[in-house]
Amino acid sequence: MLTNVIISLPLVVFIPRKTKEDKLFALNLNNYRNAHHFTMNNAKKIMKEIVERIVEGVIFPDPPYIFSYTIYPESARKFDLGNVAPGIQKFTDDALVELGKIKDDNYKIIQEVHYYFGGIDKENPRADLNIQTRQ
């Protein structure tokens, strides 16, 4: 079984709408706090579908885990790492639990979480999640 898993996650999701253009939803704490519950639920469902495609067939190591998120934004515009990474983490952790990839997202299962700035990537803005087991 693997002791290290790396998955690439989006920084935004697009929420489909019937009569208007799809809504861009940034996965950050501001939106997590302020979005309407209907919008939030749609974003969560879409993120779960994305995570499901990414981790299909991946066997996760046994817990406890250390999660490290490395953020690669699209532009050099300043952003708050503590606003972006926890939003992505919340959506991802919930999806991994719902998909049965990890048992829970409490402190006994995920014992450490780290956030890093990885540099600008105009071609592929993303958050890379490195899941390691605690030895």
Q: What is the predicted function of each stretch?
A:
Residues 1-135:
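Catalytic phosphate/metal-binding cores of nucleic-acid and nucleotide-processing enzymes, i.e., regions
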